[in-house]
A protein has these predicted regions:
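N-terminal acidic, glycine/proline-rich low-complexity segments
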Residues: 1-177
Length: 177
């Protein structure tokens, strides 16, 4: 991917940009809401803070752990081999600590790796979009014109932007000031 080059700001301009905003702050929340629980709290807090924040939009972004699926399955097999004293079957590389800890957390909940749905990016974005709508519904706040679907995949090249309702809206809001 091509390197991004941002313009150099003067020290005064940098300090100005970093100052805490006064008054009502316009925000866009770009979130993978269905991925972890913290995003629901962020949306709820922002929505319930109209004296501080003006939510221009909440946009759903893609997420996926499908690229970790094989690693997680192998880590689970590795741990099962150790548990069953089948050490000789563990000839391949030791799984990463990341994968081992993930499997341990699953097992603590009584879940096997094969029971986990490893969604693709398009599914992750749609799950996030639906979760944002759920948060708005639970708060009894209308979502029409406020919640937008994002891209269905990750950016592969800076030269090939991915068009989505969210990206078009973000561009329009940036242009309108």
């Amino acid at each position: 991917m091509k390197e991004l080059k941002f313009p150099k700001l003067s020290k005064d301009k940098m300090i100005e940009k970093l100052e805490h905003p006064s008054g009502l702050t316009r925000i866009i929340i770009d979130t993978d809401t269905a991925n972890e629980i913290d995003d629901q709290f962020a949306i709820a807090w922002a929505a319930l803070s109209p004296e501080k924040l003006k939510i221009e939009a909440v946009t759903a972004e893609p997420f996926s752990f499908a690229h970790h699926q094989r690693e997680i399955f192998e880590a689970e097999q590795y741990l099962e081999n150790i548990e069953n004293n089948n050490i000789e079957k563990n000839i391949s590389e030791t799984p990463t600590n990341f994968a081992l800890e993930w499997v341990k957390r699953l097992h603590k909940r009584g879940t096997k790796a094969k029971e986990v749905k490893f969604v693709n990016t398009d599914e992750g974005m749609e799950l996030s979009y639906q979760e944002i709508l759920t948060v708005y519904d639970k708060l009894s706040i209308p979502s029409k014109g406020k919640v937008f679907r994002g891209s269905t995949s990750y950016l592969k090249s800076l030269d090939q932007p991915i068009k989505s309702d969210a990206s078009e809206l973000i561009i329009d809001l940036a242009k309108s000031g």
